[in-house]
């Protein structure tokens, strides 16, 4: 039996021999044939020690040191012992006797496993929120990485063999929890150090500071790399997924959150090494999460949800979304130097997102946020879109690498920092590239993962998904297409990389078609047929919405430009005519002021019936203004008639027909104005022009009900005034009146007709006073396009007319105060009312015309109001607003968050002023 050494002899041997590398150790053993070694200690005389005794005693000795209370130098001494053990393990292939003593002894191997597990438990027991001093944090990071990699030295460099040994150990669950905790502590101290460096000026950062940051980052990467290698094997990751401490209490998620949130600035020299190292760490932790989420024995995410830590998982999902935005923004750009591989960050983020989008806990989160990223990608120019997702030969790709960790060098560097001998050169570890993917395979995987995420979010499972989420994803994509794509993706691409707004509809549809064709070529090698079919359904549903959205907006823009040009042209024409008139009067020596007053008096009783005051064939300002006003009224009338005419079944053919007719109308108007300016228009031509207006009105008006049907509804309203709100009764009357006409009247069409009737009665009350019979429409036209809009001024001048005024009663006074010839004006104070007539709040009118977030204010008879205060009975966070959307908000509180004020669109007939 070998006699064991005394502890003091072991301490001397460890302190003296850990500086010797395996080559030097081998030479010392050869010089002494009795399997002993001489070393110089603090004593004057050299000492000789039996290697066999030292090897058998060393693991037990270090375990005893670990179990002792904390004292100065304890961590450094343990690291010295770990370093010496690694040197002995490296020497075993060249020394058979040492191999027999160190590796073949089962009991000794078990002691070494216990040693590593105890050290890791001690390092990972307490979760840190802040780091120790700079040197202590570096020492702890090195000790964690060294202990984990010592397993490869005395068990096997193959991680599969290591998994089998660890799973057979009785304390494997405690080790797994402590190992993740120890790595988390290393990352937390690194994160604190990086945040501190960001506040430093670059001039204050010396070479030593940069080296320390790089060294710390490499130790953290090496420790995480060890855990990642174990999680590559199914038995180990299944054991991790079952660990309640890691899964239920969120240990793995905290580690992932800490790593994914690492941020550094490239201001200091050598940052490239650190940037690449942190990026590879993010890629590895994403891969670990993906493996754990796909565990078969237990649902990792369900365990997290049951433990009440789903908020941690959503924080990680948010970081994944940031990586997707950044990665897709850089996907078509050149990557960093090949000397510093960044890891498969984008690819692993997409793999993890594929898992999360298929989970009910995260479906709504990615539907809300990833749809915005998706729409921005679809807005890329066709060339950039093809190079990113529809190509097998990419201009750039991600590269992955593993650190060839050198335990002896790492421990030696940090120990030299504490010794009086001074600091040595920081070790730079070699990187072994792990690119087992060809360029085409990488490109196909990236495209297939992109398609799988679309398929997961667009797929509707009735038993799992809520009914309100049926079309939510595609609606969010449409909402994203209306936004600026550069505000969604990280602003790294030039503006030319995106399709112009005027061509967005065509460009997005073209990109969708290219993606479909390329996806079909990936079946079945990279993409399954089910995901492809879901992509096709998504494209088939999205393209009609795109055509409807962007073609209609383009038509509106063109019509607006046309009317703006007409207005400018008519104004210039009138000014030219006015200048010519003034010059002519001055040339004749006439009274300029008197004649101008006579000619330009718009309310002159001797003016012609159509108010076209002409002097030598020149049309004055009033004639021009009335013509323009007529065109505007026709435009509004056409829009209203189109709304009633379609009743939810508007078609592109009807819109196209309307455009042709408007074009003919504008041509006739243009001819008339040209003729009026030159004095060449005759009375019969003038009459013919107005016949064109009447013809346009009659052509566009299409009554959905005949006189008998309207009579039936009027009688029904007399008996049941609330018919508009009673859906069952409304459906019954729709069926009844359908039997009296040539067309089938639906309940929604009848409701639309009743709404229009109610609006006309309200406008008639404003302009002519209250109707005598509330249930009779009188001579009100059916279509809202057949009467002037709510903002129209009275067409007949009332000044200088002799009329008999009716004394104003209290009712008349109230009506006069709440309406005017001008209608609602910008800046006017108003009260907002609900359907029951109750006051909701008070505000100021912001806009009354034009468009606001896709709403035509004149056509829909609405205006934009800034609400200053809400009634006490209403909760702004719960009260839904009309015309709500993702862009403007759906409640008063959401509107306030969008604009900084509660800005809403409100029906004019529900405003009091």
Swiss-Prot record:
The record ties this protein, via SMART domains, to: HOX
Q: Which controlled-vocabulary keywords does the entry list?
A: DNA-binding, Flowering, Homeobox, Nucleus
Q: Fetch the InterPro entries from UniProt.
A: HD, HTH_NDX, NDX, NDX_C
Gene Ontology terms: biological process: flower development; negative regulation of antisense RNA transcription; root development; seed germination
State the tissue distribution.
Answer: Expressed predominantly in dividing tissues such as young leaves, root tips, flower buds and embryos.
Keyword Protease on entry: no
* DNA bind region: 698-765
GO MF terms, alphabetically ordered: DNA-binding transcription factor activity; sequence-specific DNA binding; single-stranded DNA binding
The Gene Ontology CC terms held by the record are:
nucleolus; nucleus
Q: What is its main location?
A: nucleus
Role, per record = Regulates COOLAIR, a set of antisense transcripts originating from the 3' end of FLOWERING LOCUS C (FLC). Associates with single-stranded DNA that is part of an RNA-DNA hybrid, or R-loop, that covers the COOLAIR promoter. R-loop stabilization mediated by NDX inhibits COOLAIR transcription, which in turn modifies FLC expression.
Listed name of the protein: Nodulin homeobox
Which organism's genome codes for this protein?
Answer: Arabidopsis thaliana (Mouse-ear cress)
């Amino acid at each position: 039996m070998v006699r064991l050494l005394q502890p003091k002899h072991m301490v001397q041997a460890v302190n003296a021999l850990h500086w010797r590398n395996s080559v030097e150790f081998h030479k010392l053993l050869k010089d002494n044939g009795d399997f002993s070694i001489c070393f110089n200690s603090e004593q004057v005389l050299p000492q000789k020690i039996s290697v066999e005794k030292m090897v058998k005693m060393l693991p037990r000795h270090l375990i005893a040191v670990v179990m002792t209370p904390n004292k100065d130098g304890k961590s450094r001494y343990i690291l010295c012992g770990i370093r010496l053990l690694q040197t002995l393990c490296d020497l075993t292939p060249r020394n058979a006797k040492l191999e027999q003593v160190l590796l073949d002894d089962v009991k000794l191997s078990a002691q070494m496993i216990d040693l590593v597990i105890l050290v890791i438990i001690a390092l990972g027991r307490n979760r840190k929120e802040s780091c120790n001093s700079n040197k202590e944090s570096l020492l702890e990071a090195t000790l964690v990485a060294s202990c984990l990699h010592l397993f490869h030295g005395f068990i096997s460099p193959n991680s599969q063999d290591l998994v089998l040994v660890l799973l057979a150990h009785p304390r494997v669950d405690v080790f797994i929890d402590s190992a993740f905790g120890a790595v988390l502590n290393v990352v937390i101290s690194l994160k604190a150090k990086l945040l501190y460096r960001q506040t430093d000026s670059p001039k204050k950062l010396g070479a030593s500071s940069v080296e320390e940051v790089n060294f710390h980052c490499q130790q953290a990467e090496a420790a995480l790399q060890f855990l990642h290698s174990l999680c590559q094997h199914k038995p180990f990751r299944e054991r991790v997924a079952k660990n309640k401490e890691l899964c239920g209490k969120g240990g793995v998620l905290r580690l992932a959150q800490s790593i994914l949130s690492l941020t550094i600035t490239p201001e200091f020299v050598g940052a490239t090494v650190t940037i690449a190292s942190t990026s590879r760490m993010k890629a590895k932790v994403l891969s670990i999460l993906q493996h754990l989420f796909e565990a078969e024995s237990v649902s990792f995410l369900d365990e997290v949800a049951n433990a009440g830590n789903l908020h941690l998982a959503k924080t990680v999902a948010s970081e994944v979304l940031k990586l997707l935005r950044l990665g897709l923004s850089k996907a078509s750009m050149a990557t960093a130097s090949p000397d510093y591989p960044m890891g498969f960050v984008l690819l692993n983020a997409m793999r993890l997102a594929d898992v999360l989008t298929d989970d009910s806990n995260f479906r709504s989160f990615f539907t809300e946020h990833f749809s915005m990223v998706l729409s921005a990608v679809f807005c890329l120019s066709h060339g950039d879109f093809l190079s990113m997702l529809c190509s097998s030969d990419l201009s750039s790709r991600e590269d992955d690498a593993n650190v060839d960790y050198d335990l002896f060098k790492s421990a030696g560097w940090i120990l030299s920092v504490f010794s009086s001998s001074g600091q040595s050169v920081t070790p730079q570890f070699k990187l072994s590239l792990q690119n087992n993917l060809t360029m085409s395979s990488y490109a196909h995987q990236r495209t297939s993962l992109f398609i799988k995420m679309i398929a997961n979010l667009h797929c509707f499972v009735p038993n799992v998904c809520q009914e309100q989420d049926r079309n939510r994803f595609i609606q969010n994509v449409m909402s994203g297409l209306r936004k600026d794509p550069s505000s969604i993706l990280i602003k790294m691409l030039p503006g030319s990389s995106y399709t112009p707004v005027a061509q967005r509809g065509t460009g997005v549809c073209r990109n969708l078609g290219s993606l479909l064709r390329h996806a079909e070529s990936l079946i079945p090698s990279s993409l399954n047929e089910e995901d492809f079919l879901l992509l096709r359904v998504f494209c088939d549903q999205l393209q009609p919405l795109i055509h409807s959205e962007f073609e209609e907006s383009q038509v509106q823009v063109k019509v607006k430009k046309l009317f703006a040009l007409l207005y400018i042209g008519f104004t210039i024409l009138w000014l030219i005519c006015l200048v010519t008139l003034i010059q002519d009067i001055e040339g004749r020596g006439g009274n300029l002021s008197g004649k101008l007053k006579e000619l330009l008096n718009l309310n002159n009783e001797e003016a012609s019936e159509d108010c076209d005051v002409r002097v030598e064939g020149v049309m004055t300002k009033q004639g021009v203004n009335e013509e323009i006003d007529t065109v505007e009224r026709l435009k509004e009338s056409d829009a209203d008639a189109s709304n009633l005419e379609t009743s939810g079944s508007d078609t592109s053919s009807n819109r196209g027909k309307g455009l042709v007719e408007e074009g003919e109308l504008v041509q006739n108007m243009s001819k008339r104005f040209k003729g009026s300016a030159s004095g060449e228009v005759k009375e019969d031509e003038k009459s013919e022009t107005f016949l064109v207006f009447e013809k346009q009105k009659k052509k566009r008006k299409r009554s959905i009900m005949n006189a008998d049907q309207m009579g039936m509804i009027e009688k029904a309203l007399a008996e049941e005034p609330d018919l508009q709100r009673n859906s069952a009764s409304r459906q019954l009357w729709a069926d009844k009146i359908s039997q009296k006409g040539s067309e089938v009247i639906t309940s929604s069409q009848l409701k639309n007709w009743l709404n229009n009737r109610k609006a006309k009665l309200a406008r008639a009350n404003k302009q002519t006073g209250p109707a005598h019979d509330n249930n009779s429409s009188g001579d009100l036209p059916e279509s809202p396009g057949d009467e002037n809009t709510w903002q129209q001024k009275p067409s007949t001048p009332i000044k200088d007319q002799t009329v008999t005024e009716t004394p104003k009663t209290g009712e008349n006074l109230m009506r006069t105060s709440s309406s005017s010839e001008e209608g609602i004006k910008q800046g006017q104070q108003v009260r907002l009312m609900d359907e029951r007539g109750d006051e909701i709040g008070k505000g100021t009118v912001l806009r009354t015309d034009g468009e606001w977030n896709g709403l035509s204010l004149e056509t829909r008879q609405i205006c934009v109001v800034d609400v200053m205060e809400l009634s006490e009975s209403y909760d702004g966070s719960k009260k839904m607003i009309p015309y709500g959307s993702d862009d403007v908000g759906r409640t008063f509180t959401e509107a306030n968050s969008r604009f900084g004020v509660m800005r809403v669109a409100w029906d004019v007939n529900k405003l009091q002023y």
